[in-house]
């Protein structure tokens, strides 16, 4: 599996460039994300040809029925670096980091239905939380970023995919809504 590393303060420009290239988001949204939600230890990167070619963020903060959750967001790989296992390495490292930091559950909302199987086969994730609605509790900085992002994208899946740390019972979580997906 390719090597990954935690992001560094000097990576912000390269991360912003990759984010814009893959997602097309504007500079205001990306800047708000870095200001409100991101710390270097929440981001993993993989490099190819001497530059950041893949990234992902795993954001702590939400709670579901007393369980600490983390959320994988903005997984992106440069088009010319795809199919090399970079994103899989980044995602695996993010999940490992989250569990080592005390998360009970790591969740994500795949960008489209086609990615659900990718998250399932690479990381053992399965459908869990409902997209939208009450249930999961979020910190204030998440609420602030959500106001900038806007509402849900109707084209994203209706369930978040998640994996629990060993020994964690997820019974009852399938009825909880996860309102802040930033999609």
Regions found by a protein language model. Give the residues of each.
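Conserved active-site tyrosine of GNAT-family acetyltransferases
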Residues: 119-120, 125, 146
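Short glycine/proline-centered loop/turn elements that form peptide/ligand docking sites
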Residues: 91, 114-115, 134-138
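Intrinsically disordered, low-complexity, positively biased terminal segments
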Residues: 133-183
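Conserved GNAT acetyl-CoA-binding A-motif
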Residues: 91, 98-111
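Conserved acetyl-CoA-binding loop-helix of GNAT-fold acetyltransferases
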Residues: 77, 83-98
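Residue-level detector of high-confidence beta-strand sites
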Residues: 55, 128-130
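Alpha-helical elements of the RecA-like P-loop NTPase motor core of helicases
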Residues: 13, 116-117
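A conserved beta-strand-loop-helix scaffold within acyl/acetyltransferase catalytic domains
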Residues: 4-7, 12-76
């Amino acid at each position: 599996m390719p090597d990954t590393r935690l992001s560094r303060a000097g990576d912000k420009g390269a991360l912003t460039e990759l984010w814009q290239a893959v997602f097309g988001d504007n500079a205001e949204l990306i800047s708000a994300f870095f200001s409100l939600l991101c710390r270097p230890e929440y981001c993993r990167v993989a490099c190819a040809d001497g530059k950041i070619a893949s990234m992902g963020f795993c954001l702590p903060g939400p709670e579901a029925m007393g369980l600490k959750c983390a959320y994988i967001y903005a997984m992106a790989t440069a088009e010319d670096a795809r199919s090399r296992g970079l994103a899989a390495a980044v995602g695996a490292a993010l999940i490992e980091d989250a569990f080592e930091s005390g998360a009970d559950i790591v969740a994500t909302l795949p960008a489209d239905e086609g990615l659900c199987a990718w998250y399932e086969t690479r990381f053992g994730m399965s459908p869990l939380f409902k997209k939208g609605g009450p249930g999961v509790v979020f910190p204030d900085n998440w609420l602030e970023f959500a106001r900038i992002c806007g509402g849900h994208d109707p084209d994203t899946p209706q369930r978040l995919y998640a994996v629990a740390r060993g020994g964690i019972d997820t019974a009852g979580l399938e009825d909880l809504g996860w309102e802040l997906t930033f999609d």
